[in-house]
């Protein structure tokens, strides 16, 4: 297959005119979205349906992952008014499900965990019925930071392993074992909270390696999985090594479901936040849940 030319199934059109109102609102509230910063191919579809993944803690990342289009540089301090603006957007868009993510902020003592907590709390005050999903960085493996995020009681917490261990050089500053440990710790701190992870395919991995990662994710009791095609944002980013066939995504979805993932999104255009509301709202039906991630018996203050 010619990897320099996208196949027919990967030629989704982006139409900026279709989401002018969404652009206007985000500009008014001075909010970033990963949809724009990462040049997501689903932006027209999601913005037209008034769905967005909000990017808090600025638009500059402290790591240099070779696959990512988020700006690298020296970030600004967290904006204390940002949580209120995100909450205002949730209300004005009448969102039933909102996804919050951020660049990696290794420059902050808590990695930005406190800003996540403030954002979840503010949304909870003004839109208590909205399901809040977080897609977090690894916080350098800090259990204290993870405990703070869990205590804020989002319904779903995601952390992407992104690729197979052999290719982790593309994730500057990241560690495969640490990412698995993050997901394991989230489950230990809040057994009733759904966890989620995702992989990009087409980076040069083998199917056997993908299946091994899926097995690792199940060993840390990861609830949800997303599998999508990697598309290089520019010629300066890590190149696409393969355009994975749609039927391969279908087969991997079937295998993942047999492994025990509660819900799987798998397809060329799938991204970790794509069709986020379809994952079931985040409550694990096999665990008692009183509020978000925390059940009546749980607490993290002593961790």
Curated annotation (Swiss-Prot):
**Does the record's keyword annotation contain Iron?**
yes
Q: Which cofactor does it need?
A: [4Fe-4S] cluster
Q: Which Pfam families match?
A: Radical_SAM (PF04055)
Give the E.C. number(s). Answer: 2.8.1.8
Annotated localization: Cytoplasm
**InterPro entries referenced in this protein's UniProt entry, alphabetically:** Aldolase_TIM, Elp3/MiaA/NifB-like_rSAM, Lipoyl_synth, rSAM
Annotated [4Fe-4S] cluster 1 binding sites: 35, 40, 46, 273
Which stretches make up the Radical SAM core domain?
Answer: 47-262
Annotated S-S bridges: none
Q: Which Gene3D superfamilies match?
A: Aldolase class I
The UniProt GO MF terms for this protein read: 4 iron, 4 sulfur cluster binding; lipoate synthase activity; metal ion binding
Pathway listed for it?
Answer: Protein modification; protein lipoylation via endogenous pathway; protein N(6)-(lipoyl)lysine from octanoyl-[acyl-carrier-protein]: step 2/2
Q: How is the cofactor bound?
A: Binds 2 [4Fe-4S] clusters per subunit. One cluster is coordinated with 3 cysteines and an exchangeable S-adenosyl-L-methionine.
Its domain of life reads: Bacteria
Q: Which GO CC annotations does the UniProt entry carry? A: cytoplasm
| Catalysed reaction equations from the record | [[Fe-S] cluster scaffold protein carrying a second [4Fe-4S](2+) cluster] + N(6)-octanoyl-L-lysyl-[protein] + 2 oxidized [2Fe-2S]-[ferredoxin] + 2 S-adenosyl-L-methionine + 4 H(+) = [[Fe-S] cluster scaffold protein] + N(6)-[(R)-dihydrolipoyl]-L-lysyl-[protein] + 4 Fe(3+) + 2 hydrogen sulfide + 2 5'-deoxyadenosine + 2 L-methionine + 2 reduced [2Fe-2S]-[ferredoxin]
Per the record, the major location class is cytoplasm
- Amino acids binding [4Fe-4S] cluster 2: 61, 65, 68
**Can you name this protein?**
Lipoyl synthase
| Native species | Geobacter sulfurreducens (strain ATCC 51573 / DSM 12127 / PCA)
């Amino acid at each position: 297959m010619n990897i320099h030319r996208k196949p027919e199934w990967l030629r989704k059109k982006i139409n900026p005119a279709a989401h002018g109102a969404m652009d206007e609102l985000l500009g008014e509230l001075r909010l970033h979205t990963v949809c724009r910063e990462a040049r997501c191919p689903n932006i027209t579809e999601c913005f037209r349906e008034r769905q967005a993944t909000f990017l808090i803690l600025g638009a500059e990342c402290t790591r240099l992952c070779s696959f990512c289009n988020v700006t690298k540089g020296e970030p600004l301090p967290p904006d204390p008014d940002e949580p209120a603006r995100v909450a205002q957007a949730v209300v004005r868009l009448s969102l039933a499900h909102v996804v919050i993510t951020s660049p990696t902020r290794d420059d902050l003592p808590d990695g930005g965990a406190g800003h996540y907590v403030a954002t979840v709390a503010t949304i909870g005050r003004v839109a208590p019925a909205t399901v809040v999903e977080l897609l977090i960085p690894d916080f350098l493996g800090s259990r204290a930071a993870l405990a703070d995020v869990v205590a804020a009681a989002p319904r779903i917490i995601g952390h992407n392993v992104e690729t197979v261990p052999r290719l982790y050089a593309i994730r500057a500053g990241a560690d495969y074992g640490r990412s698995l440990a993050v997901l394991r710790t989230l489950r230990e701190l809040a057994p009733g909270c759904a966890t989620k992870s995702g992989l990009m395919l087409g980076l040069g991995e083998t199917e056997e390696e993908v299946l091994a990662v899926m097995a690792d994710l199940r060993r840390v009791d990861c609830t949800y999985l997303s599998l999508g095609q990697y598309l290089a944002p520019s010629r300066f980013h890590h190149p696409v090594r393969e355009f994975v066939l749609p039927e391969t995504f279908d087969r991997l979805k079937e295998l993942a479901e047999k492994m025990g993932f509660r819900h799987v999104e798998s397809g060329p255009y799938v991204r970790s936040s794509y069709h986020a509301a379809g994952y079931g709202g985040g409550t694990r039906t096999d665990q008692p849940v009183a509020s978000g991630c925390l059940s009546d018996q749980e607490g993290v203050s002593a961790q």
